[in-house]
Amino acid sequence: MPRIRRIRKLAPAAAALLASAAVSAAEPEHPDFTGIWTTYTGAAQGRASGFGGPATNLPLTEEGRRRVEEYRKLVGPERLNSGAHCADYGVPGMMSLPGSYPIEFIQKPDQLTIIFEVNNEVRRIYIGDRQLPPEQRLPSRAGYSEGRWEGDVLVVRTTDLLDGQDQGTPFSEEAVIDERFFVSEDSNGTKVLTYQATINDPVYYTEPVQIVRRYEPYDGFILPYGCQDELWYELLDMRRAQLEAGEPIDARMSDVYKAREEKE
């Protein structure tokens, strides 16, 4: 067969192979969560684990029950809300709070950055083998989050948490939170991002506690939302001192301002 005819005969097969390779290269290896999301409106989701005090019917240990009762005394019948005084929601609170506040995901191969509009709170999930050594991880409200892919599901383990006594699902510094993120579509074709969290904490709970929240795309923006939380912690310290002294637990934010003025 003449050389030119062989080339013409092979050309369609080569073109098909190149096209297939191009499509494969264009397909992402994992789902991309990048975008702004808001609470899914397709179905009721129940109580979230944000601020507002501990939920009822939690499988509490005796120590967990004691801590819950202590916190309820600290916040009083008016149920003081730490979120209203600028304390970070942390994990899982910022992931599971319902309402109109959007949440933004920015995804890179080795990191998922999540920004909650309230307080412009940020958490980072580090994906893959490149991780901070355990001895260098500092406890925080959001903890340290280490992620890996299991197919199309991002699996995350969050540790190094500060005490979350004020959460709807409270936890101690010993808590480990296992999380899962994945995307699907509902019957109407709406894209749905599902967040699942399992709290394992032998101090508070006799068994794991699970949280599920769902999000849908939000056609809007994350807006600036600055706030400082020092006043909240000072108020809580005042009330804790009253509790330990057996005094009425009635400190108010005005008392915090007055104490600050006296120190100046």
Regions found by a protein language model. Name each.
Residues 20-22:
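N-terminal signal peptide c-region/cleavage motif recognized by signal peptidases
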Residues 2, 24-264:
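Hydrophobic small-molecule pocket/channel-lining residues, especially in calycin-type beta-barrels
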Residues 2-14:
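Bacterial N-terminal signal peptides that target proteins for export
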